[in-house]
Every structure is written in C-alpha cells, then in structure tokens.
Amino acid sequence: VIVGITGVGYGLHLESDRPGAPLGAVIGIAGQSQRAGFYAAFDAASGRRLWQFDSTPSEGWEGEFRTTTPDGAPLERDIAREKATLGQYRQAWKSGGGSAWTTPAVDPDLGLIFAGTGNPSPQMDDLTRPGDNLYTVSLVALDAETGKLRWHFQEVPHDMWGYDVASPPVLFDARVGGRTIPAVGQASKTGWFYVLDRRSGGLLFKSEAFVPQQNLFRRPTAEGLEIAPGAVGGASWSPVSYSERSGLAYVAAAHLPVRYTVREIPAHGEESAVRYTALEPVEGPKWGTLSAIDVRSGGKIRWQAKTPEPLVGGVLATAGDLVFTGEGNGNLDAFDARTGELLWQFHCGAGVNAPPVTFELDGTQYVVVAAGGNAIFGYRQGEAVIAFALPR
C-alpha cells in the first residue's frame, strides 16, 4: 500500500479494523497472506516450470547478524534484541519478502543469471524478523540450468529503509590492479554503484556517492529522522548503461530525502498494539542526477549532470559517444558521453520516465522512447511512443 502522492509511504496490514488505523492500511485477509519472493524458470515451448529460487531460505535466513554492510558501512541494529527473539520468530522467513521485480542479466559463458531482490517484510519495521533476512536486498547469482544459488551480495542486511535492489544489473569487463575482470555492476538506492567479480561475487569496488547521503543506515525514531537517500531515492528501477568506448557506466538517480517516523496504533480490546514506520517526503529541494562512473579507475565520477526533477527512467549509451536519458518535465536529452555536455534536447509532451532504446532498420539507426509520465511523482502523463532517426 503506497500512501502519499509522491510514492513515499508505508505498507501496513491489519487483520481487522480498529481505532487509530492510518489511511491506506489494508484490513482483512491480505494481512495474513504475505509470501516470500522468488525467481522461476519456465520451458519456453511447454510452459513447464523448470526451477524456482526463493528469496528467503528456510535455513540460514538469519545470517550472521552483521553490524556492517559488506563494504564496511555501520548498521544501527539492536543485535541483542534480535538474537533474544530469534526463537519466537523462527518462521519469519515464510513471509519474509524479497520480492523479485527487476530484470536479470545473463552470462551464457558462465551459465549464470544475476538478479536483484527486494526488501524484507514487514517493510521498514523489523521487530518480527530478527537476523540479516537473507537473501533480501541482495544481488544473487543463480545457476541458469538449476536455479541453485552460486553466490550472493547482500547490500543492506536487515533493511529498515526500503533499499531494495531495483536497478537491473549490468555486465562489463572492469580493470582492477592491471587485470581485466568479468564484472557485474549494480546501481543502488543507497547512492553507490557496486562492482563485483561476477565469477565469485567478491566486491571489487564501490563508486563515489552519486547522490547526497545523510543519516544512512540510522535507525528510524519516534521523533522522526531525515534520511537521504530515502526509499525512492538513489537509483531505483532506472536501468544503467555502460559504454565500452568510454569505460563509463551511466547512472540516472534521484535526490529525495525522506523522514522516517516510528508510530504505533494503540492496543484495542484484545488486540495488541501495532508498530509501523511512516515515510514522509521532506520539504526542500529535490533533483535528479545523471552520473558517469569510471569503472577503470575504481568508480570515480567523471562528470555529473543535474536535472530539476528526480530521474526515474533509464539511460542509453550508443557507439556514437552519445548518452540519452529522459526527464520528468518531458525532455529527452542527449549528452556527450565523455564530457557530459548537453548536445540536444527534445520535449516529448509528457514525462519521459522509461529508458530509451536504439535499433537499426534498413541501414538507419533509430532512438525510440515512451513518454507516458509518472503519476507517483506527479509528472505530466501521456501516451506517446516517439522515434528519432539518426543521420546516415
């Protein structure tokens, strides 16, 4: 349940109505039917299911009770309380979340599928899900033939902020220590571009932050805590594009701070109190960033373009050293891939919040984009698909 026209809100399920329930709460059986997320493979000819990978395992879901992210950033967790309640919530994995809603990447040579997973459930509130909540908020590598887990990289153990792995992973070769390594990159909601060895899942490096960061991984409070990026900030569902010519990965992102406030519906009759975390947009400037991240130099940002609205579409890099992206105000932009100079702009009449694509037909290269707007962000809506032809 999304509450708030900005798309920043909270999800809350209640078994029955009660005084004090906030607007947007789901009442009834929906509160009892949560399910773990999964990826599944089907035979294209027969439709038969071949395998299924569940995002939350029955064994080991609690993990190691990590106090840091894999790259060493501290997490504000109550480990003692989590361990004390582990026995009480041993079955939490059954409704543990980890929704799979992003497009995977495939390496046919390694026989691996790389996919992102969503945040744990209950969303934001962590009292009933002690542990790291594996394999939520993770980039996972699955055997393409069997669906077995080869490795995982959990970007945020025990997520309390909505930092699901939303942007699709991208494959490229990275240069590290004079060596060329087959890599997979993932642009995160936390504001970093992670680059991993796609054979082992080992972290090669993370980029410089491509959006402002404030109170990252701090625990939400009853007084309210402003955190940036928020649940819809950083790189959300926007696909990344990589150019072999420039060695740069191009990331579209959003600066959208959010206030996280812990609230409680009082106990009523025989019903216990219900705690939840409300998310509210912070008053103040919000903007988008298009960042060119150098994967040959450890993730330095070579250039960055700022847009007046958060970027929630995607990026297209071409062999002609152009980078295309769309804005919420309706502009489709073309930048110089190496310098970031804005070279061309076309107003599409509605928010350009889908990734551009390119193809060649009868010797002519086309760039095509959908301009449909975005109701969640309040961008002007439309129903156009617009094609541009590049000169021969």
Residues covered by each model-derived region:
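Generic structural signal for coil-to-beta-strand starts
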Residues: 1, 111-112, 192, 247-248, ...
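Extracytoplasmic/lumenal domain signature
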Residues: 15-26, 32, 39-94, 126-165, ...
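Membrane-proximal interfacial segments on either side of biological membranes
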Residues: 204, 244-254
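Chalcogenol-based redox active-site neighborhoods
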Residues: 11-12
